[in-house]
Every structure is written in C-alpha cells, then in structure tokens.
C-alpha cells in the first residue's frame, strides 16, 4: 500500500535523503549533515518570505511565526529587523556552524514525533550512548528518493529542487543519491555557488576538511620545524 502523501519541509527532505532508512546512519559525515540541515531551514524560511540572504548575511523580512513549530523556533532565534547583529542581520556561515547540531536535533525530534523516523539508542563500546534514526516506514524515504531522482532527470527545473540538489552536493551526499553519474554530480556541485545557504554550508564543510588535514600533518610530524 502506498503511504499517504506527507508534507515535508526542505530540511526534512534532506534528512530523509541522507539517512539510511534501515540502519538510520547518515550516508555523509554527521557534522556536514548538521550544517546542511541548518542551511535547509534558512532556505525554507526564505521560500516562505521570512528571511533573505544578502552578502553572506541573514536578514529577517517577516518576524511573524510560521505555522510549522520548528521553523517558528528558528525564526525567533534570528535577529528581528533592526536588532541583533549590526544592520539587524546575522552572518550566515557562522550561524550555520554554531546552530547546526541544535537545529538538526530539533528536526529529528520533529520527525520522530510525526512517526516518520524512529529513534534507536546504541552504546559505543557499551558505554557512550548515541542515536540512530531509521525510517518508521521505509516506503516514505523511498518516495523522497524517487522524487529527487525525477527532479534530477528533469535538470532540477524548480527553485526548491535546485536548492535541495545544492545542499546534497554541499554536504557530500551526491555520490549516494545522484543517479546521473559524474556529469550530473558536477552539475549539482555548480549549483552550490548559486544558493546562498548551500554556499555557507559548503564553506563550513571545507573548513572542517582543512582542519582535519592540518591535524593529520601535525600528528605525523609535518607541522613542526627543526634545525640546528
């Protein structure tokens, strides 16, 4: 039986694309997905006319709470017009970096409450708890994947599809969800610079990669200097 249609926000679609429906494990780096979820929330708010992005900053256009409780909570946390950061706006890259984990947790809890995902608690080495979020109904995750594949085949003709494709590429998911091969993955990568939220996400992902590479160089002895 086909599951009933369920209205999903952009961050929810991204999470359903990113999580293995059976194991609940992300197909990309967990921190990158946190950035992507935060970026998707911002773009969803922009689609609803609540915020916009200008010069790498978030500007609130309409501070009135949207119906979705998650979006309302995030909007409330942003600067209202004329308050907060200078000129009443917030640095996009910094906001994505600082709030990504919290925003993703809110999204996951929202999906669990709606019985879209299940929350399973595991323990690393029998001690440290961590969570996995498999699909409550794998058919719904498959439907989201099928919609993405159809949009990919059509060249992502609408703004929402292009944003989702850009976020998928920015967090490193294109290899797991794209079906058009290397050429299509490059096309998705090129969308990143066209989408202000995806660009902020990608900058944070690159920063993490650079930090890891730097730590690896130092740990292997390449960061020191010697001499007589």
Regions found by a protein language model. Give the residues of each.
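Short, amphipathic alpha-helical interface elements at domain boundaries
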Residues: 1-98, 214-228
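Residue-level signal for secondary-structure boundary elements
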Residues: 22, 26, 82-86, 119, ...
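Charged, low-complexity, helix-prone segments enriched in Lys/Glu/Asp/Gln
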Residues: 38, 101-104, 140-144, 204, ...
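Short hydrophobic beta-strand motif reused across regulatory alpha/beta modules
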Residues: 51, 116-117
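Short, Lys/Arg-rich nucleic-acid/phosphate-binding segment
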Residues: 55-58, 121-126
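Short, amphipathic alpha-helical interaction segments positioned at domain boundaries
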Residues: 62-106, 113, 126-166, 170, ...
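Short hydrophobic helical membrane-anchoring segments positioned at the boundary
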Residues: 149-228
């Amino acid at each position: 039986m086909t599951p009933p249609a369920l209205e999903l926000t952009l961050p929810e679609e991204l999470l359903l694309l990113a999580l293995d429906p059976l194991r609940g494990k992300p197909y990309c780096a967990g921190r990158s997905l946190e950035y992507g979820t935060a970026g998707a929330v911002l773009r969803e708010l922009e689609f609803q006319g609540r915020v916009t992005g200008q010069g790498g900053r978030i500007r609130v256009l309409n501070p009135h709470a949207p119906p979705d409780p998650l979006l309302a909570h995030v909007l409330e946390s942003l600067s209202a017009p004329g308050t907060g950061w200078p000129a009443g706006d917030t640095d996009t890259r910094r906001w994505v970096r600082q709030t990504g984990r919290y925003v993703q947790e809110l999204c996951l809890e929202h999906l669990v409450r709606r019985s879209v995902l299940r929350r399973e608690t595991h323990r690393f080495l029998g001690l440290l708890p961590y969570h996995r979020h498999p699909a409550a109904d794998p058919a719904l995750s498959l439907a989201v994947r099928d919609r993405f594949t159809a949009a990919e085949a059509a060249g992502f003709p609408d703004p929402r599809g292009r944003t989702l494709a850009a976020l998928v590429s920015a967090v490193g998911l294109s290899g797991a969800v794209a079906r058009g091969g290397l050429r299509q993955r490059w096309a998705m990568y090129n969308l990143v610079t066209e989408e202000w939220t995806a660009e902020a996400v990608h900058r944070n992902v690159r920063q993490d990669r650079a930090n890891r590479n730097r730590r690896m160089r130092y740990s292997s002895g390449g960061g020191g200097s010697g001499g007589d």
